[in-house]
């Protein structure tokens, strides 16, 4: 009995001496939970404000807000085509730039017939260097350019070790994903600055937040587009030019069956994605453009890099 009494007495003494520490830990835990709750509520508010509220209000007059013409660079890409159609739906005329006219001529004809706006095609292969800029400069000189949409070239997304890539593929990655965006932005931005209005939208990839093995050059080029957009925002955002970085995850495309995922809630069609993305223009400077993708991005940011690397290695090896 004495041993039991001694243990109980010892326990009470220890508990009494540690009570201050326990209260401190409880306070720290409460503060942590409160901060997480505030962050969660803020994220929910941002999600609703960005993706749901704009789709409930009436359509904006984009031509009056930004300008009458849009340049779509990389117009052969599925998202870029859909974005051009969405702009045309709002009465915006489009200039489709691609290295192969045959890949965008049908899109231009469809836009003109369905929406009654002008659609011009320009062939510009940036693998040829600065000479690719001349036809673009001539075409936009007399136009009220209000939008510039630069889309990354998805055909360069090759799953190979870096040293296995040919020089032509590497130059293509640099010229068509980096040089094209930089040079066309340089052509379009002065007119926007002069008018004090305009929008530059750079479409890259949500995968730019972490490195991707076997896609080193491609993933680095998407990170460039994101960083370039954010830098331009801080340089010219206070002068009437809205610069947005779009960071989508997987989007269904018109590629042959089996080479692209079918459209679903998590993998939207280009048309669904473009409709959601355009509604975020003028609201967010950096977004996935589609609310399920924003939820994906939240998970990606919380994921330790070693977990991401393990998953990306398995995925890229499978593709």
Curated annotation (Swiss-Prot):
Residues 2-82 are annotated as: Required for mitochondria translocation. The keyword Mitochondrion applies. Coiled coil: none annotated. It comes from the Eukaryota. InterPro entries: 17-beta-HSD3-like (IPR052149), NAD(P)-bd_dom_sf (IPR036291), SDR_fam (IPR002347). NADP(+) binds at residues 74-80, 99, 125. Keywords: Mitochondrion, NADP. Its main location: mitochondrion. Pfam families: adh_short (PF00106). PANTHER family: INACTIVE HYDROXYSTEROID DEHYDROGENASE-LIKE PROTEIN 1 (PTHR44889:SF1). This is Inactive hydroxysteroid dehydrogenase-like protein 1. It comes from Danio rerio (Zebrafish). The lineage of its organism: Eukaryota, Metazoa, Chordata, Craniata, Vertebrata.
């Amino acid at each position: 009995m004495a041993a039991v009494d001694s243990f109980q007495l010892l326990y009470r003494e220890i508990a009494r001496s540690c009570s201050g520490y326990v209260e401190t830990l409880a306070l720290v835990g409460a503060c942590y939970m409160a901060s997480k709750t505030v962050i969660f509520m803020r994220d929910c508010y941002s999600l609703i404000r960005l993706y749901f509220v704009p789709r409930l209000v009436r359509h904006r007059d984009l031509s009056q807000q930004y300008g009458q013409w849009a340049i779509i660079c990389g117009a052969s890409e599925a998202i870029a085509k859909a974005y051009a159609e969405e702009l045309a739906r709002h009465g915006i005329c489009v200039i489709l730039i691609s290295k192969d006219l045959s890949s965008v001529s049908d899109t231009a004809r469809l836009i003109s017939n369905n929406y009654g706006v002008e659609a011009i095609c320009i062939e510009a292969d940036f693998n040829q260097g600065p000479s690719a800029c001349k036809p673009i400069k001539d075409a936009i000189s007399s136009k009220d350019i209000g939008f510039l949409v630069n889309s990354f070239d998805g055909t360069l997304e090759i799953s190979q070790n870096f040293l296995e890539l040919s020089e032509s593929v590497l130059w293509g990655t640099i010229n068509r994903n980096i040089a094209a965006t930089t040079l066309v932005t340089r052509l379009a931005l002065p007119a926007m600055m002069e008018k004090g209005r305009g929008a530059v939208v750079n479409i890259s990839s949500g995968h730019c937040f972490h490195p991707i093995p076997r896609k080193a050059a491609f993933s680095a080029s998407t990170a460039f587009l994101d960083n370039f957009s954010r830098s331009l925002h801080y340089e010219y955002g206070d002068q009437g030019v809205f610069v947005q970085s779009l960071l989508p995850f997987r989007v269904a495309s018109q590629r042959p069956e089996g080479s692209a995922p079918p459209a679903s809630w998590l993998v939207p069609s280009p048309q669904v994605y473009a409709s959601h993305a355009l509604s975020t223009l003028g609201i967010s400077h950096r977004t996935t453009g589609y609310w399920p993708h924003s939820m994906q991005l939240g998970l990606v940011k919380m994921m330790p890099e070693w977990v991401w690397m393990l998953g990306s290695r398995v995925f890229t090896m499978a593709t």
